[in-house]
C-alpha cells in the first residue's frame, strides 16, 4: 500500500458473494425510491493520512476507525440518529446492568466463509487487554467496566481472566465490575470488534495485509 495510492483513496470492495451473510435483511441499506444503483457496488474513501494499522486494537485515530467500521462489525451498530441497533448480536438482555448476555446471529460470516462465533469475541477482547499487544485502546475495556480489565492491563492478571465468556457458539456473556446501564452502546466501539483468531495466528503482524485480512463487515480490503 503506497502513499500515492492512499492519496487517491482507499479502495474497499463490497463482499458481494457474502453480503447476505455479512448483513441480515433487517440491517440492509435502505435505498431511496427511484435511486438507481451502479452495477458494481464499491466505496472509495479518501482519507487525509495513511492509517497506522487496520487492526481494530491498533487504531489510534479517525482514519483507522473509519476503515475498521467498513471492514468489521461489532455486537451492535448505531443508526444515523445514534440509536443502538443490532449488529452481530440480534438481541441482548440484562437484569442488573452488570451481567449482559448477547445472542449472536447464526448467519454471521467472516469474509472467508467461516462463521462468526462468541468465541471470536472472547478472543478479540482478551487480545485487546493483553499487555503484550500494546493496544493504545486497551483502556476502553477498563472504561466499559469489563471485569478484571484494569488488573489485566496492568499485568496483575492473565488475559483469560477478563469477564467475557462463551457458553456456546452463539451466546456471549459479559461480566462487569459494577453496573453500567449504557454498556450495550459501548460495544459499538471499534476496539471491541471481533477478529479472526486463525488468521491472526497464521500471519502474525502481517494479518492485516491485502490478501491476508479477513473481516466480518460489509466490505473487504481490495488494494
Segments (PLM) and residue ranges:
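N-terminal lobe/hinge region of extracytoplasmic solute-binding protein
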Residues: 46-96, 126, 212-219
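Hydrophobic residues in beta-strands and at strand termini
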Residues: 47, 94, 103-105, 166, ...
Amino acid at each position: 500500500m503506497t502513499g500515492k495510492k492512499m492519496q487517491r483513496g482507499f479502495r474497499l470492495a463490497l463482499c458481494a458473494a457474502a453480503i447476505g451473510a455479512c448483513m441480515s435483511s433487517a440491517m440492509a441499506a435502505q435505498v431511496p425510491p427511484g435511486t438507481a444503483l451502479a452495477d458494481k457496488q464499491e466505496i472509495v474513501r479518501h482519507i487525509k493520512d495513511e492509517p497506522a494499522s487496520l487492526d481494530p486494537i491498533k487504531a489510534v485515530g479517525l482514519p483507522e476507525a473509519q476503515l475498521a467500521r467498513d471492514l468489521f462489525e461489532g455486537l451492535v451498530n448505531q443508526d444515523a440518529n445514534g440509536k443502538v441497533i443490532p449488529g452481530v448480536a440480534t438481541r441482548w438482555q440484562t437484569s442488573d446492568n452488570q451481567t449482559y448476555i448477547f445472542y449472536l446471529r447464526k448467519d454471521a460470516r467472516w469474509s472467508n466463509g467461516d462463521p462468526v462465533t462468541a468465541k471470536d469475541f472472547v478472543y478479540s477482547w482478551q487480545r485487546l487487554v493483553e499487555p503484550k499487544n500494546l493496544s493504545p485502546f486497551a483502556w476502553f475495556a477498563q472504561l466499559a467496566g469489563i471485569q478484571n480489565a484494569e488488573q489485566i492491563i496492568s499485568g496483575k492478571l492473565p488475559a483469560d481472566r477478563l469477564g467475557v465468556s462463551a457458553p456456546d457458539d452463539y451466546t456471549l456473556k459479559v461480566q462487569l465490575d459494577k453496573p453500567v446501564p449504557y454498556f450495550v452502546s459501548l460495544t459499538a466501539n471499534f476496539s471491541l470488534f471481533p477478529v479472526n483468531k486463525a488468521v491472526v495466528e497464521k500471519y502474525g503482524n502481517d494479518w492485516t495485509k491485502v490478501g491476508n485480512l479477513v473481516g466480518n463487515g460489509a466490505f473487504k480490503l481490495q488494494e
